[in-house]
Amino acid sequence: MWSSVANLKENLNKIAHDVHDDDEDDDEDLTIYGSTNGGTDRRNSNGFRYSRSPMANGFESPVNPEIERYKAEINKLQKSESEIKALSVNYAALLKEKEDQISRLNQENGSLKQNLTSTNAALKESRLDLSRASNNNAIKGNGDHSPNRSQRSPTNWKNRNQMNNGIASKPNGTENDSESHKKEKEFAEMLEERTRSMASAQARELEKEREKSANLQILLQEERKQNETFKEELQSLRLDKEKTLMESNKVRRELDAKLAEIRQLQMKLNGGEQHAFGISRENLKEVNKALEKENNELKLKRSELEAALEASQKSTSRKLFPKSTEDLSRHLSSLDEEKAGTFPGKEDMEKSLQRLEKELEEARREKDKARQELKRLKQHLLEKETEESEKMDEDSRLIDELRQTNEYQRSQILGLEKALRQTMANQEEIKSSSDLEIRKSKGIIEDLNQKLANCLRTIDSKNVELLNLQTALGQYYAEIEAKEHFERELAVAKEDAMKLSARLKDVDEQLESSKKEKEEITSKVLHAENIAAEWKNRVSKVEDDNAKVRRVLEQSMTRLNRMSMDSDFLVDRRIVIKLLVTYFQRNHSREVLDLMVRMLGFSEEEKQRIGLAQQGAAGKGVVRGVLGFPGRLVGGILGGGGGSPDSHPNMASDNQSFADMWVEFLLKDAEERERREAEDAANKEQEKATVSSTQRPKYEQSDSEFSTVPLTSSNSNHRLSRLLT
């Protein structure tokens, strides 16, 4: 019991020493932060000389949001300080409760020692009483006589008998003496047997009590070993926690180094007004938000781990120390009660043994429960460690991506530096305006520094108050750990705020350059849209022309269908004139006459009157020489007016070729009409004139094939029919 209390005191002293060491480290960190604060202000002022103001870029100065952030941080610190005070009060109450428990345990230990001494004395007295009672019962059968009388009783009884008998005979005396000796021997043997039985029973009871005490000591040793294992596990958990903190600090340092590299690159690019890295402001804000979220998640995880460690420490301490002490007190009190009431009967001893066994089983069950809880906590901590390792891997991936982006930005910077050399001439005019803005910014920075100094003073005053609380509480300073942790987070938050302000300035400059690039791209897009609209207009015009051509085709096909009924009896007047002229020019050529016969569809009698006989295909080779037509076309035309049934098989193929040529002719006629319409519209629009000029040679080439004998539409056929009638 005393060893467990001593272990508790040693652990508490170690915690107090650790807290004192952490306080000294945090004080050194605060002094370093205060000393570096001026250096950072100077660096910022020197950086503002080379950087352009946000007002020149067209944006408002980011002073107001920074002030609001600082105010919000101050409010958070005040809330955290109030929480620290509440925690300190709660911890003080807990410490008082623990001190009360320790005092109670000391009192219980003192009472247990007194009970042990009293039980030992009671055992001795009970043994003496038992020996006296046994002697008295053996001699007189009553327990009222004293032990001195019981010892003298046999000798007095002998003397009295001898005196009463007077002068007795020797044989009677010898017989009486022998009987008395026998009785005395029997009585002595009975006493010895009883004393032996009582001694053996007492020895057995003592051995049982010794075994119980040995078992209790073994249990105590096992509990001590378990306490040591729990302490080792707690130390391992603390080491793991420190490792995770070291890894998170490494990640933060790497991020800070990368941010410093980005700042240097941005300081190089601050002189150029119209150039940027190619990354928009929204993307950088998202990156900043993502980094802030990751930092918050790491902080939350750290707080959760600390809470879990504290909970595990409290649970282990509550399960190990108070329960063990209560069990020991119960066991000892039960032993005292049982020792006080064992010797009258054995049933009480057996009941007490059963109680002790039940209590041992309950203690073992509680021990198993504690082990199960420890295993569960270990598994939970391992899962958290795996999750943290996965998140660290994700952070490393993000860091690699940031490195790649930095390398890409460096390559862009090399290209941008060439452009910056050209803009150096414009910087002299910008410097004059930037100097005024730098002065304004210096004034703002001084105000902010004053506010920061006030904040630091308030923090120092709060630190003094916390130190006073530490002196009042004594060794148990666990609440200062939380306060110092918050101060470290404050310093980190301030550094992050400075970094974010510098980032915002760089992002503003990048936004300007990105806006300019956006304007250029929009101008290009508008130009491309105009070109696309022109092409769309042209395509729509071509589609309209195609629709018109389709309509003309449909009309011409309807005309053809109408004309096909009367085409067998109609021939163009100009064809007949051309045939007659060629007939007389060639001195009444037989071939021309045969062609006229086929053309006009003479009967056999009319041919005999003229002096022509039927000839198979005499006029097919003459057609191209006379009219300039292909042979199949003219053959179809000539065979169109024939009424004899013998000429129909040849006419079918010729009519088919003529139909194809006729469709082509109608298409070209429609194109000529559209060309005329396009020429009329060309006077109003220049673009249509260029399109119509490209189409003109095609139309001329298409018309050259029928230049010798121009065929007309249904109107010419009607005229020819009128002449024939």
From Swiss-Prot:
- List, as start-end ranges, the regions of compositional bias called Low complexity: 711-725
Main location as per UniProt? Golgi
Location(s) in or outside the cell: Golgi apparatus
The processes (GO biological process) annotated in the record are: Golgi organization
Q: Where is the composition biased (Acidic residues)?
A: 21-30
Which UniProt key words apply to this protein? Answer: Coiled coil, Golgi apparatus
The GRIP domain, residue ranges: 562-613
Can you quote a single GO CC term?
Golgi apparatus
Give positions of region: Disordered.
17-62, 134-183, 191-210, 311-349, 672-725
Question: Which residue stretches does the UniProt record annotate as biased composition, category Polar residues?
Answer: 148-175
Q: Which residues form a coiled coil?
A: 66-132, 191-316, 344-407, 437-563
**For bias kind Basic and acidic residues, which ranges apply?**
324-349, 672-688
What PANTHER family does UniProt report for this protein, alphabetically?
MYOSIN HEAVY CHAIN - RELATED (PTHR18921), THYROID RECEPTOR-INTERACTING PROTEIN 11 (PTHR18921:SF2)
* Protein name per the record: Golgin candidate 4
Organism annotation: Arabidopsis thaliana (Mouse-ear cress)
